[in-house]
A protein has these predicted regions:
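Contiguous, function-dense segments enriched for cysteine-driven chemistry
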Residues: 1
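Membrane-proximal intracellular helices of multi-pass ion channels
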Residues: 4-254
């Protein structure tokens, strides 16, 4: 009887563990739903500073500006940005930086998620044709991705400082470049900066556009595998082709 009771308890515990584990898994459908809800929530919250400061008093316009920032679209309803307070300029560019890697990827790198598989959250959130788990734990993968992202941002920031930009302007430029959306703090964008600054921004926009899995492979010294990536080769091929076409198109201007 004791053996039978012990066996019954074991079976019940195994069943409860299976149910609990299954309930903690984010499937693809739940991943997309969670991503959509998080994007909606953070966009509404992100619009609040614009409205409260009076920089964008219309809530709809403020929401548009915020969504444009988080999605790194780069569209703006502002006729000019040079008169905006520094705090708003920082927040506007920071939305680009957060959105460049993805809001949920940022949260996954910070929040302790327990149990289950959260890779579908990253699949639903991250840009590009696919997202690979760089390491077994999704949270660790998110930390690696944002670690690389942060490191590239710091490197660009240092190059901009070396080119004569002040600390604040260098920070905003690095944020806008990382998101590849182009939010700036000058009405004429980068036309007012030196060729050195323009080259730095151009190079780092290209670097930030590369799949970050390739950077992880480079850190592991798997150079051949990183170079053989069809996505990376197609990416640089499209850039070179576009540069060639644009060069031919504007050659008469110079």
């Amino acid at each position: 009887a004791l053996s039978s009771a012990a066996s019954d308890v074991y079976k019940r515990q195994a069943l409860l563990h299976r149910i609990k584990t299954k309930s903690q898994i984010f499937y693809m459908r739940e991943g997309f739903a969670t991503t959509a809800l998080c994007w909606l929530l953070i966009s509404v919250v992100g619009a609040v500073p614009f409205v409260l400061t009076g920089c964008i008093p219309n809530p709809v316009d403020a929401l548009f500006e915020t969504v444009s920032g988080f999605t790194t679209t780069g569209a703006s309803i502002l006729p000019g940005v040079e008169d905006l307070p520094k705090g708003i300029l920082f927040w506007r560019s920071f939305t680009h930086w957060i959105g460049g890697m993805g809001v949920l990827v940022f949260l996954l790198s910070l929040l302790p998620l327990t149990g289950g598989s959260h890779v579908n959250l990253m699949k639903a959130e991250s840009p590009g044709p696919q997202v690979d788990k760089l390491v077994p734990k999704v949270q660790s993968t998110a930390k690696i991705l944002y670690g690389i992202y942060f490191a590239l941002t710091v490197v660009e920031f240092c190059f901009l400082l070396a080119g004569g930009m002040n600390v604040f302007d260098s920070m905003l430029t690095a944020f806008g470049t990382a998101g590849t959306g182009g939010f700036g703090f000058k009405n004429d964008s980068f036309a007012s900066f030196s060729p050195y600054i323009q080259w730095v921004v151009t190079i780092f926009m290209i670097l930030f556009g590369v799949n970050f899995n390739a950077y992880f492979l480079l850190l592991l010294r798997r150079f051949r595998r990183a170079a053989s990536s069809e996505e990376v080769r197609a990416y640089f091929g499209i850039i070179l082709a576009a540069v060639a076409v644009i060069t031919v198109n504007i050659r008469s201007l110079y």
